[in-house]
Amino acid sequence: MMERHITKEVQIGNRWIGGNHPIAIQSMTNTKTEDVAATVAQIKQLTKVGCEIIRCAVPTQEAAAALTEIKKQITIPLVADIHFDYRLAIAAMEHGADKIRINPGNIGSRERVKAVVDVAKERRIPIRVGVNSGSLEKGLVEKYHGVTAEGIVESAMDKVKLIEDMGYDNLVISIKSSDVMMCVKAHELIAKQTDHPLHVGITEAGTLISGNIKSAIGLGLILNQGIGDTIRFSLTGDPLEEIKSAKLILRTLGLRKGGVEVVSCPTCGRTRIDLIGLANQVETMVSEFPLDIKVAVMGCVVNGPGEAKEADIGIAGGVGEGLIIKHGEIYKKVPEAELLPALRYELEHWSED
């Protein structure tokens, strides 16, 4: 079993990260933060599927002011994402942000950074120091002859030291790159240099397919070394998909229990049902159930029962009929049209099993 990189404990609103606390799943809204109704609606949807920390862009004073009302209507910690204008960071904290994300390098002078730190210190609000490979300082690019993991880490640690020298260490660090292996190496390096909690993600990962693959490889390699306290799957698309992917990778790595895992066969010439459609329907349906079980969806009654042995429950389709399989044994036969309702019934009564 992997040995976890133990970091300092940091409180973000009603949630603790770091230490031995579970790795928290984070996402970011894609609504206009000023649109309180739309932003709250999206946060509630994300919370329902398992988002545990939410970040909102704060590009204007109007967006900062909207945080007050947003906070009243949500139940998970709210992080304000700030770029360039230190006054927005201060306003976001005054309007209830549980954490702020800044890059001290683009906030401005040392005095402006200190103004932000002073308010954070007064309110005990954690600061996430974020550094991306795309915004690496020219001096570090020249020093390392290009954008490198070493340069990213040095940039982040310089900014952390800047804030620590101001007498504040309630920090979270984020170092990101769209280059997967560079991002992995950077996390390996920084984990040896700091005990501040680390937020892990692959930035600009891409659309659903490419983004999931890149994020799964990158986050998988990082998390499997015990590194990481919060994670985000950055996908170009519906943020709800980010949460599904994040939950799955944590479960796959054995870092989190709970949630129904669906396994399904890849189909072959023996398949006699619309297995692709059925598997997708099952995956959508099981997300409603707070169970810690494995569900198998198989395409034929020949190999289905054997292949579903490792699952807690499964279904296997045939011509006009199908099987319900429980704990590797055929439980009952049902008409094909009743496979999905029969599975739902079994899941609804699983606690009675």
Segments the model singles out, each with a brief description of its role:
Residues M1-S27, K121, T284:
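N-terminal amphipathic alpha-helix/helix-capping segment at the start of soluble metabolic enzymes
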Residues R87-R128:
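Hydrophobic or amphipathic alpha-helical targeting/insertion segments
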Residues T60-I82, A115-I127, H187-L198, V282-T284:
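Alpha-helix-loop-beta-strand connector modules within alpha/beta enzyme cores
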Residues N132, L140-S287:
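Catalytic alpha/beta core domains of metabolic enzymes, predominantly
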